[in-house]
């Protein structure tokens, strides 16, 4: 069942041929996140990071969640095309999804504003994690949400700077 967020639905009803600036599209693609399925053993994460490092591809963001037998490493990399090709060649089990990456100039106040905007738009955050780099000198957070288009539109409308894959590629 498809769901349209409350704010995006009301914005769509009010839209005319003159689109407001807040509905503009991001320059460049959204950010690709790789979910890598790893055995829960010592050194498994190191193997993946070394595989990328040898190919001069940098881990830009990382989050790991574990269970008894396995772990899922969520990775944002500097060159997603190379990563996808490499994972396929080396038979690394993975999935790909899109995340919204938001720059936070003042984390203490902006994080509350960001989450409140998503709640008002009825956008669910599945998980979030910080970037390891500061692409433009500020903190940034990756958000896996149930509606990337609505989240992007709402956050841009609230004045947040969204980062594209081009912004984080080194």
Where do the protein language model's features map onto the residues?
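A conserved regulatory-domain signal marking ACT and ACT-like small-molecule sensing domains
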Residues: 2-5, 9-170
